[in-house]
Amino acid sequence: NLKKVNKKILTMSENQDETDKGEYKHFMFKEIVEQPYTVKNCIDEYVDSIKKNINILNFPIEPKNINKIVLIGCGTAYNSCLTAKYWFEELTSIDVEIDIASEFRYRKLKFNSNNLYIFVSQSGETADTAAALDICKKNNVKTCSIVNVIESTIARNSDWVLPIHAGIEIGVASTKAFLGQLTVLYILCLKLAFVRKDIE
């Protein structure tokens, strides 16, 4: 149709040096060794140790009004959601539900504007998770994504993004990303517990 299209240019945040195995024989071993740095990156990003404060701000819903948290993911991300469910139930007064994204897509769901739907994905491009997010957007509910790639589709389509800062991960076992997801979910859980006065 000869219409001019203005495309938005995104600069990728990854450091290409991370694609080198360096002194390690396998990427998986290298990434296991890098796990503590992932946790440190998350703590540095979200925790102010001097002021003793958790710097998670700009909630899409007033924390005290959150009725339920729905955690959605596939594979490794789903497993991190399973673990986080125990933390939210133990530390907060918020009801928690977990869904595998591929099943969430095809269920007859009742959406609530006071529910927070959290999508967990390393790449931010997981097809089923992205499709589940689209369903939530069409139903005008608030969404959050916990991803490693902040330029990804899931991150861009969410109301709120919490990066896990794991860096490039090549090993299929998803060692760094899993630990990063758990760390961010736990910090988020603590923040909600403090804000809602569930713990002092």
PLM features per residue range, with description:
Residues N1-K64, A77, Y86, E90-T92, ...:
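N-terminal segments that mediate ammonia production and transfer
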Residues K64-D198:
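Glycine-rich phosphate-binding loops that contact phosphosugars or nucleotide phosphates
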